Amino acid sequence: MSKPTITVIVPVYKAMATLDRCVESIVSQQTEEPIACILVDDGSPDDSGKMCDAWAARDPRVTVIHQEDRGVSGARNAGLAAAGSEYIVFLDSDDALRPGALQAALDAQRRAPHSLVCWQYTTEEADTAPVTSAAE
């Protein structure tokens, strides 16, 4: 696999209910550049770590770091230390990217290279029904 342009770092702790949706939304992104996903199992006491390992076994773009609980900042920092890409995206394990989100972010960054790229979001309940949306 060639060096990724974008790495998505996901801290994982007690995320069994949401992890598959999160990772699927990452690995299904259509991008012109290679992407990677780093799942940081932050000492989760449930089977979230095993779920991370299963994703890594299925998709070579997914890697897993297992560590003792260091909190979300410690997990993000571990992911940053392991990433070797030009761009970093942080995603929480209960989040999901919309189709095309990574390519849109990459395009926006390249149009304005000294900028921070942010995008809109939708808050959903457990049944994934939209509740609120951020302004575009």
Region locations from a protein language model:
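Nucleotide-sugar donor-binding/catalytic module of glycosyltransferases
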Residues: 1-136
